[in-house]
Amino acid sequence: GPESSGKTTLFNELKTLSGFNFISEYSRTYIDKINRPYQYNDILEIAKFYVKEIETARINKRSLISDTDLLTLLIWCEYKYDKCHSFIKESLTKNPPDLYLVCSPNIPWEYDPQRENPNNRVELFDIYLKKINELGIDFEIIEGNNSKRLIQAKNILQNIHL
């Protein structure tokens, strides 16, 4: 889902589940590390990290829960720069996830210096749903307060990870 939609909060709560590999949001770490405003090509470097982590999870034959992924990077590139690296598009279509849990922006915006779109969350949410549908990937919308979101997500994951 879009910025400030509860992805990281939900991700951190799901890390208690066993049988999964977890990928934290690398974009924040990368942007903090470069010590300058990010640029278009930085998103490609972030994508390379995610692809490596996805490949590691596949080699280990473990299900993967990711705070953000290549879809987020694809939308980020297209929304901000009106273009996207072919590596991101190809990697996403080559190894699509089995399911997206898409966090609804129905919770209050929380300021963060790396966040850029406080007024565009519903628009971005719609873009996520459109892209996921275009890619033909299953998804579930996660909404409500944090405890409801966690219950929803755990129920979904338990049903597909029997």
Language-model features: locations:
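Anion (oxyanion) recognition and catalysis
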Residues: 16, 58, 133
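Conserved substrate/cofactor phosphate-moiety recognition/catalytic segment
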Residues: 12-55
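Conserved lysine of the Walker
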Residues: 7
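The conserved Walker
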Residues: 3
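Glycine-rich phosphate-binding loop used to anchor ATP phosphates in small-molecule kinases
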Residues: 44-95, 114
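Anionic group-transfer/hydrolysis microenvironments
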Residues: 26, 68-71, 104-106
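A glycine- and Lys/Arg-enriched "phosphate-lid" helix/loop adjacent to the NTP-binding pocket
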Residues: 81-148, 152-155, 161
